[in-house]
Amino acid sequence: YTNAVIHEVQRIGNVVPFSVPRAPTKDTIVGGYTIPKGTFTMINLTSLMFDKNEWETPHTFNPGHFLKDGQFQRKDLFIPFSVGKRACLGEVMARSEIFLFFTALLQKF
């Protein structure tokens, strides 16, 4: 449950609304739209984190978004650290530190 709460805080908090700019190396078609080679694009992370098709209650704090049968389950559209070759290099360390900070805070209360 702790991981579900942390992930939901990151989803709702959404510190970085857009991903790092990227550019395709060749002409690409996405969803019927042509994106010419070299065109700068960015993923709108806010639209992913609040997508009504992905999240049961997108504008409500609900750790249940990350629970299935009482067990933590990460969703594919949850990408606060981006994805691919340009994902945050410090993601593993940041996740560990967030978990340790949050659990230490809970132990004090």
Label the predicted regions.
Residues 32, 88-92:
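Conserved, non-catalytic sequence blocks in retroelement Pol enzymes and Pol-derived host proteins
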Residues 74, 92-109:
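Cytochrome P450 heme-binding "Cys pocket" and the immediately downstream C-terminal segment
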Residues 69-79:
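Active-site-adjacent bridging/hinge elements
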Residues 1-32:
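Conserved cytochrome P450 K-helix E-x-x-R motif and the immediately C-terminal K′/meander segment
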Residues 13, 27, 43-71:
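Conserved cytochrome P450 K-helix/beta-meander segment immediately N-terminal to the heme-binding cysteine loop
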